């Protein structure tokens, strides 16, 4: 793991594309494609400092994972009966999760059709950081790059590629992305009172949904 060397040039667009490639394919500078990750890229960076921190954190991985799991279960128990809030659930047979994110679905119809963005802003105003999670990544531009690449255009007729584009539709995935609200893993490492604060804030927003509309 790691990166080294340098790339220099006088073509701004090319240099921006090089930067994007080394940083997960994310947009930068003159990159004007839709989505957060318009091209295929990588991320191989690691410093000695990061390695030292990582090694020390390994000692806590079991206890932190246990703590996040317990707090996630408690949070679910607190918010599962709030109308319009649908906590995530683990598949049958799954004994624990890492909880990189704790997601739940926000059904705006139960909140007087208050948009998700407004709900999240109100939640942040209560001191609870949150985000909308990931968008529909199949629309970020990576697939289109593959479809227009030399390998694909040589291997498949245009009609087949156009058909694939037409069939590229995942409404259930899109709905999940539209409804998702997420907490980052660090929120699950605090004491029980922190989890109560999160649940109480969501309950407060529901009770005052008329004022949010």
Residue map of PLM features:
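PLP-dependent aminotransferase class I/II
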Residues: 10-213
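Glycine-rich phosphate-binding loop of ATP-grasp-fold ATP-dependent ligases
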Residues: 2-7
